[in-house]
Amino acid sequence: MKWQGRSRRTYTGAKIKKARGKRKYELGSEPADTHINETKKKNVSTRGGNRKVRLLQCNVVNVTDAQGKTQKTSIENVTGNTANEHYIRRNILTKGSVIKTPLGDAKITSRPGQDGVVNAILLD
């Protein structure tokens, strides 16, 4: 788990005296880093007793064209990613990634690590 609270040190390096301990709601989690492979999901419990589906691996995408028609197709590879240029080489799927499909290039509109599904729109 990753703690997302304040640093224990000031910008000059001095230690800050602790007024209280850590809280569970201050914990974060590691990124899912969804890869292209056979579909693998993981259920995570969240605040309020809700569930979140982490998509760890996926090789299919729901692609919508300009006319609004949606079809399920396979993902070949990642050709662009504005989040991190190194994700292209590692074939990591994030929101905004440009992927190559048999229908053409598509841009991912969902958040695979939090939604549990990959949706995309076809680029012209």
Task: Report the location of each language-model feature.
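Ribosome-associated RNA-binding proteins
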Residues: 1-124
